[in-house]
């Protein structure tokens, strides 16, 4: 029984983000469709070859996407919203781009499909839309074309296909409501056709992804698996693939399916390998997801060997990445600025392929010497002074319940704040950032590259902050911000100023479409060596009599948008960050900053996949925020900002944050989000976003007034603030001025009654 290795998918964007550049060039009309397609072909060929050279036995095909793999699956099934269709009913790459971004070089612009987080990762997918009575047919043959491409290059391939039930689960019904699961029988013939085409090409195994099987699915959805897979069996061998959590709770459903193998995530799941082996049919192949596909740490291969060795020789076995390597940067070898010790702790996608090859060789031969050699740096890390800071660990251990409590309840604080700030009814503010103009980005880049000295850089930033204050005073806003000209990214900026973080040069991962992010890496205990935001906040406040908000990114968001350590809990990391930022709150307060905003946009997206695990996460997530904020005096007003569309199920936790003011994204939902705050009888102040900053459209005074009146029907007017949905970083100044002027005017009209 020879053990093979495989990956579940590989990063698409290219080492130098070639895909991003090709997409954006094509969208801008600067290159042809054929030039774009050629870049895709070149990247796929390179990535297959790189995986093969690293020792991967079975190469994934179908993991490449022009925008997103869920959207690719939608097109494969002929699921194109009416507003995005070509007049002749054909489907081409521009159809795909119209769904993803609302427009393409050809065809009529139309509202893009909704985008949301892929399970609990920082990748986003395009939500499939379902309407009653829609038809499905094979219309987009990208998967088959790419299989032909890989076979022509002589590769041993394993096509990757998103499974039918997970695809339906991820979608939403539009218009007249019906049960989307009722579409299952309509899409299965298309899946059968695709599998038949793959069988014709001599394909032995197909990886069929059903990550929905790690969720707490309703019984009707679990019951749908057996008839669905009865319909799909028989043409090729199916590797039922799950990830991001364990499968034990749904194992009875899984073991009844007519598939030939199962992939499990043994990194993020709590499944016991020996127990799985006992419960799976004896003729099934088990694909063990042992190498973490969504973090950057080198694996302790000796540990992985021990984890799996008891079932070697007892059943067909493959070793694999836990999930697609899509969530990992591509290649560590091009990182030239990391010091040797820290670099030796990491493994990016290509290094993870090498880890799989080493592990596979050792399991086949029984010789573990190479595993011990590979694992030595990560074992040595456990004792590194770069990792452990006794002062931080001591401070964390000394936290008491008192450290997460403000001195007084909201009602007492609100009175002190009213006396201090004397704000009018319907107070106006913005969320934090102002347009990041070319001048600002050039200034930061020149400084980073060493083309500009520190004095000239600081003079330039100071001028942009001064302009932001002047603009806001001219517009008549009540609570101002400094505009964040000095910040490249709301997480990276703080990571750069905290001990315990490192940064890469090319550690890009895809967020959605052409957007890539370069997350910081938490390598050790987190502390704050010096104040971070105080100087610029103090400078901005010195130029106006109106209050200027201090702006911090909250501990849970910094954690969720970074690559975390694996040797301590996420709770520990979040609380260490909270303690560091608690000192920042105290310093801002001492510098005369009376309103401090702590953004937590990621609080909800950090939720575990299983509801049964939510309470524990929310408990420490809320506690981290409160540790961060609780040092503030009664007359210091703490704001928080959150931007997502679902509050109902976590309202208790939102209230437990005990922020004096929460600003939220509500304009796109026409204030419907406020329903949860009304039903909960949310006690503190709320700023429902009155216009969508993701659109260049300027809202009218009347439109904003109408939204605010609607809000006042749900929340008492004396507790309402007036603000945009989100930061204004991505907007231009002309539309920003126009929109804010209308927003201020609407507030003034309401004050006059």
From Swiss-Prot:
Binding positions (L-homocysteine): 431-433, 484, 599
CDD domains: CIMS_C_terminal_like, CIMS_N_terminal_like
Binding-site list for 5-methyltetrahydropteroyltri-L-glutamate: 17-20, 117, 515-516, 561, 605
Names of the cofactor(s): Zn(2+)
Domain of life: Bacteria
Binding site for L-methionine: 431-433, 484, 599
The record's free-text note on cofactor binding: Binds 1 zinc ion per subunit.
Transmembrane segments: none
Pathway: Amino-acid biosynthesis; L-methionine biosynthesis via de novo pathway; L-methionine from L-homocysteine (MetE route): step 1/1
SUPFAM superfamilies assigned: UROD/MetE-like
GO biological process, one term: methionine biosynthetic process
Binding, Zn(2+): 641, 643, 665, 726
InterPro entries documented for this protein: Cbl-indep_Met_Synth_N, Cobalamin-indep_Met_synthase, Met_Synth_C/arc, UROD/MetE-like_sf
Gene Ontology molecular function: any one: 5-methyltetrahydropteroyltriglutamate-homocysteine S-methyltransferase activity
Catalytic residues of the enzyme: 694 (proton donor)
Catalytic activity: 5-methyltetrahydropteroyltri-L-glutamate + L-homocysteine = tetrahydropteroyltri-L-glutamate + L-methionine
Keyword Transferase part of the UniProt annotation: yes
EC number: 2.1.1.14
Keyword entries, A-Z: Amino-acid biosynthesis, Metal-binding, Methionine biosynthesis, Methyltransferase, Repeat, Transferase, Zinc
Gene3D superfamilies per the UniProt record, alphabetical: 3.20.20.210
Family statement drawn from the similarity comment of this UniProt entry: Belongs to the vitamin-B12 independent methionine synthase family.
Function: Catalyzes the transfer of a methyl group from 5-methyltetrahydrofolate to homocysteine resulting in methionine formation.
Cross-referenced NCBIfam families: met_syn_B12ind, PRK05222.1
Name recorded for this polypeptide: 5-methyltetrahydropteroyltriglutamate--homocysteine methyltransferase
Organism listed in the record: Escherichia coli O157:H7
Gene field: metE
